[in-house]
From Swiss-Prot:
Active-site residues annotated for this sequence: 30, 108
Domain PPPDE positions: 5-149
Entry protein name: Deubiquitinase DESI2
Record-linked PANTHER family: DESUMOYLATING ISOPEPTIDASE, DEUBIQUITINASE DESI2
Organism: Mus musculus (Mouse)
Main subcellular location: cytoplasm
Subunit structure: Interacts with RPS7.
Amino acid sequence: MGANQLVVLNVYDMYWMNEYTSSIGIGVFHSGIEVYGREFAYGGHPYPFSGIFEISPGNASELGETFKFKEAVVLGSTDFLEDDIEKIVEELGKEYKGNAYHLMHKNCNHFSSALSEILCGKEIPRWINRLAYFSSCIPFLQSCLPKEWLTPAALQSSVSQELQDELEEAEDAAASSAMASAAAGARTGRHTKL
């Protein structure tokens, strides 16, 4: 074991989602665990490998434009060495695969809490994952949210459908434009003998 290192929970406001959920008194937050000057977090993707990633601590811009840093919460300290933490994160990656992500049942806050419990024996504050907690108590709440928020597969399906629709619209517009050009060319290119 090594020197005591602070274990910090970095919390980010997901304000695009909060526009919908704040009306029912629930905030939606992303979180990551900072230790040794590195921040580990979990997110979804449609593939069966680890969804754990690393960002610069507190840097919301690395998460995307819809995230805003909210606060840092000191959870405790750990004696694990940095190499040990890398191994722990790698092991957690077997459980926290990208395609296992679910907003209510296995999200970034569940990961942060699991890592925090290993590193310093403490869960994250309950208010950070309140939406998931309420969803387990009030199952219909999940049905009120857009399905593409819940899993990466649903999001990918939604995005794929939107892209397909846009592609079809572009093809239709191009075909209409080509037909209009051909019709205009046919009218202006007509010569009559007198």
